[in-house]
């Protein structure tokens, strides 16, 4: 699993925190950030440079003939797919944690409100005697 990342020298893909991708001239620059260890100020990162693939395609207009386009490198596409799997898995875990915490806060509010309601009813009963 994660063979493309391992081929880049990333032997522990589970340590990947996030990544960024930008284009510079005819290259795509991939920067992969790893989780910070305790006491570190900055996350470790590695940078990879992929040349964009040049393709000649038929132009839309019949009179223009052909035009050259630049596309993302196929190898980079596979690496990004693996990075997305890793990063989205982390996002799902964070979303689940947030949902559980939100549910707990809601439950806490409901229980507090119900306790106040019961105490109010008890107060009414004791005042009546």
UniProtKB/Swiss-Prot annotation:
Lineage, top-rank taxon, reads Bacteria
InterPro entries from the xrefs? UPF0325 (IPR020911)
Classification via HAMAP family: UPF0325
Describe the family membership recorded for this protein in Swiss-Prot or TrEMBL. Answer: Belongs to the UPF0325 family.
Name of the protein described by the UniProt record:
UPF0325 protein Spro_3794
């Amino acid at each position: 699993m994660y063979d493309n990342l391992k081929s880049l020298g990333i032997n522990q893909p589970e340590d990947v925190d996030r990544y960024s991708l930008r284009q510079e001239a005819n290259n795509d620059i991939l920067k992969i950030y790893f989780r910070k260890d305790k006491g570190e100020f900055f996350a470790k990162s590695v940078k990879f440079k992929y040349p964009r693939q040049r393709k000649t395609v038929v132009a839309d207009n019949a009179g223009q003939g052909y035009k050259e386009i630049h596309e993302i490198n196929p190898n980079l596409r596979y690496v990004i797919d693996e990075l997305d799997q890793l990063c989205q898995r982390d996002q799902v875990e964070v979303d689940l944690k947030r949902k559980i915490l939100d549910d707990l806060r809601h439950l806490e509010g409901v229980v507090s409100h119900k306790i106040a309601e019961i105490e109010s009813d008890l107060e009414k009963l004791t005042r009546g005697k």
